[in-house]
């Protein structure tokens, strides 16, 4: 496996760049956010990479950080989601935003991405929702979780939901959710009813 690449940018295309390292120019497909962040032609860049080996091709994918690469790997593990669709999804937002959409079951947001229809969006949510730990995402660290939401998490866990499921339900609460524990619990339970 080629885990990372450091080299000089030779060219940047719509969905790829060519990085020269050790006298070899490597074609690396990447999400738009990575392409926008790599720098200018002629400058040195560093990318986290994933090599996908197929019968007819060796294809290298590059990412600006390990979180992007990890999410890409999860996405291509979903039935019906190939590297191109995964790159389109990664180009639509930050890994945190995408993971929150998946955990929150935001099928409409996912289906707006080119190449992803409603069925594929539903499959992504179904297969990945339980694998996303919202506590690891920026903006949802334990210090940022309110006491009310910690209590709600404890209640949901005591009702038999996993910590990940509880975090997903809390993340799916609307921004204007009532500040009472009872109302937030009712909304969280509705989340499970619609899942």
UniProtKB/Swiss-Prot annotation:
Source species: Chloroflexus aurantiacus (strain ATCC 29366 / DSM 635 / J-10-fl)
Keyword Membrane among record annotations: no
InterPro entries: DNA_helicase_Holl-junc_RuvA_I, Hlx-hairpin-Hlx_DNA-bd_motif, NA-bd_OB-fold, RuvA, RuvA_2-like, RuvA_C, RuvA_C_sf
Main localization of the protein described in the UniProt heading: cytoplasm
GO cellular component: cytoplasm; Holliday junction helicase complex; Holliday junction resolvase complex
Pfam families: HHH_5, RuvA_C, RuvA_N
Region described as Flexible linker: 143-151
Primary role: The RuvA-RuvB-RuvC complex processes Holliday junction (HJ) DNA during genetic recombination and DNA repair, while the RuvA-RuvB complex plays an important role in the rescue of blocked DNA replication forks via replication fork reversal (RFR). RuvA specifically binds to HJ cruciform DNA, conferring on it an open structure. The RuvB hexamer acts as an ATP-dependent pump, pulling dsDNA into and through the RuvAB complex. HJ branch migration allows RuvC to scan DNA until it finds its consensus sequence, where it cleaves and resolves the cruciform DNA.
UniProt similarity note: Belongs to the RuvA family.
Organism ancestry: Bacteria, Bacillati, Chloroflexota, Chloroflexia, Chloroflexales
Location(s), subcellular: Cytoplasm
Name the record gives this protein: Holliday junction branch migration complex subunit RuvA
Protein origin, superkingdom: Bacteria
Region (Domain II): 65-142
GO biological process, one term: SOS response
SUPFAM superfamilies according to UniProt: DNA helicase RuvA subunit, C-terminal domain, Nucleic acid-binding proteins, RuvA domain 2-like
Domains as described in the record: Has three domains with a flexible linker between the domains II and III and assumes an 'L' shape. Domain III is highly mobile and contacts RuvB.
Quaternary assembly: Homotetramer. Forms an RuvA(8)-RuvB(12)-Holliday junction (HJ) complex. HJ DNA is sandwiched between 2 RuvA tetramers; dsDNA enters through RuvA and exits via RuvB. An RuvB hexamer assembles on each DNA strand where it exits the tetramer. Each RuvB hexamer is contacted by two RuvA subunits (via domain III) on 2 adjacent RuvB subunits; this complex drives branch migration. In the full resolvosome a probable DNA-RuvA(4)-RuvB(12)-RuvC(2) complex forms which resolves the HJ.
Keywords: Cytoplasm, DNA damage, DNA recombination, DNA repair, DNA-binding
Annotated spans, Domain III: 151-195
Region (Domain I): 1-64
């Amino acid at each position: 496996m080629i885990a990372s690449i450091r080299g000089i940018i030779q060219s940047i295309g719509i969905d790829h760049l060519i990085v020269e390292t050790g006298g070899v120019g490597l074609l690396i497909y990447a999400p738009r956010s990575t392409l926008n962040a790599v720098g200018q032609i002629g400058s040195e860049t560093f990318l986290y990479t994933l090599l996908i080996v197929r019968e007819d091709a060796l294809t290298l994918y590059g990412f600006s950080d390990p979180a992007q690469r990890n999410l890409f790997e999860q996405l291509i593990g979903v039935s019906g989601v190939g590297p191109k669709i995964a790159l389109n999804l990664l180009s639509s937002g930050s890994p945190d935003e995408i993971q929150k959409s998946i955990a929150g079951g935001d099928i409409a947001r996912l289906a707006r991405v080119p190449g992803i229809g409603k069925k594929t969006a539903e499959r992504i949510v179904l297969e990945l929702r339980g694998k996303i730990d919202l506590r690891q995402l920026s903006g949802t660290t334990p210090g940022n979780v309110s006491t009310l939401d910690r209590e709600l998490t404890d209640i949901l866990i005591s009702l038999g939901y996993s910590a990940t499921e509880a975090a997903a339900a809390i993340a799916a609460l609307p921004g204007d959710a009532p500040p009472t524990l009872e109302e937030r619990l009712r909304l969280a339970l509705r989340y499970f009813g619609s899942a």
